[in-house]
Amino acid sequence: MVSFISISQGVSLCLLVSSMMLGSSAVPVSGKSGSSNTAVSASDNAALPPLISSRCAPPSNKGSKSDLQAEPYNMQKNTEWYESHGGNLTSIGKRDDNLVGGMTLDLPSDAPPISLSSSTNSASDGGKVVAATTAQIQEFTKYAGIAATAYCRSVVPGNKWDCVQCQKWVPDGKIITTFTSLLSDTNGYVLRSDKQKTIYLVFRGTNSFRSAITDIVFNFSDYKPVKGAKVHAGFLSSYEQVVNDYFPVVQEQLTAHPTYKVIVTGHSLGGAQALLAGMDLYQREPRLSPKNLSIFTVGGPRVGNPTFAYYVESTGIPFQRTVHKRDIVPHVPPQSFGFLHPGVESWIKSGTSNVQICTSEIETKDCSNSIVPFTSILDHLSYFDINEGSCL
């Protein structure tokens, strides 16, 4: 159990925390565009298409214990550097509001400079670090912008596609449905772009500010589709509250537009839900495959255990996760609690054009893991100069 109290500047992770505290036994209440109904577990819901057994096979790659050492390795290395240069992490940790999961909420002024972190072409377990191309950065920026639109009340629940980021990234977008749950405030929408030939499924993240937060619990729940896989109980519960609202809508859109691709995205908690949704779509909808289904997350937390991470990798579904500088959220729940990121990481190291890609499909000690435990809540609020958490 980890606790921290109010943050004087920046955002709290209020909705993220509510999901972290939400157990699988919670009673979910959800609704589509203002209506309300009771949702049940996605894994047990007869209204959903059945699981495709061949798409739920446990991963053959069992990984290694070293996969869970990337973050602890850098925490020790960077803490030693910090203390050898006169810093005192022990004094920072004396107040619960300074650390969460061992990570700093507010960056110390004398933290190790980010320039000491991984550089391009450096080797690590399972891949290398390369510089993102201009085209790749434009793509990452686009999905950060689309994820930001979910914070606009005019979009969810307003059903209006008229915000600044809306018109910038998908000018011909048509909202098919919005969805929301009352218990965990899970929100999102399904959007179609005929020019881009794309069906978007977008989840809203955290947007509550300056609140007191205590007793974050990192509980696992069995991930029923895949033997041995476990995911965060709160993330799964919050996701399951809305699956009935969006799933048939995506299916209807695929039937009407069979050549369109499906892209799932979200920021913060929305990133966790996007990953779960992407896997659910792949496991139940035979028309979707790595050729027409992709997942892009922005500042998303860790979702599951190593078996879940290796399973996501084994599906072949393209999964790109973007992390801004020292954003703390991608480092919770901590690796030390048994959580592991799947996906190719794109790390905004500085500015908006210095972006590194860790090519491994499982997180390594490079990219954003290279700066722990010196993280910051402020870097969670902006990606590629796009405000995340507010509609601007």
Curated annotation (Swiss-Prot):
Residues 50-69 are annotated as: Disordered. One of its GO terms (biological process) is lipid catabolic process. Keywords: Calcium, Cleavage on pair of basic residues, Disulfide bond, Hydrolase, Lipid degradation, Lipid metabolism, Metal-binding, Secreted, Signal. Belongs to the AB hydrolase superfamily. Lipase family. Residues 1-26 form the signal peptide. Optimum temperature is 35 degrees Celsius. Hydrolyzes ester bonds of triglycerides as well as of their derived partial glycerides with a strong 1,3-positional specificity. Its EC number is 3.1.1.3. Disulfide bonds join 152-391, 163-166, 358-367. It catalyses: a triacylglycerol + H2O = a diacylglycerol + a fatty acid + H(+). GO terms for cellular component: extracellular region. This is Lipase. The active site is at residues 268, 327, 380. Its main location: secreted. Pfam families: Lipase_3 (PF01764). One of its GO terms (molecular function) is metal ion binding. The keyword Lipid metabolism applies. Limited proteolysis produces a smaller peptide starting at residue Ser-124, that has altered substrate specificity and biophysicochemical properties.
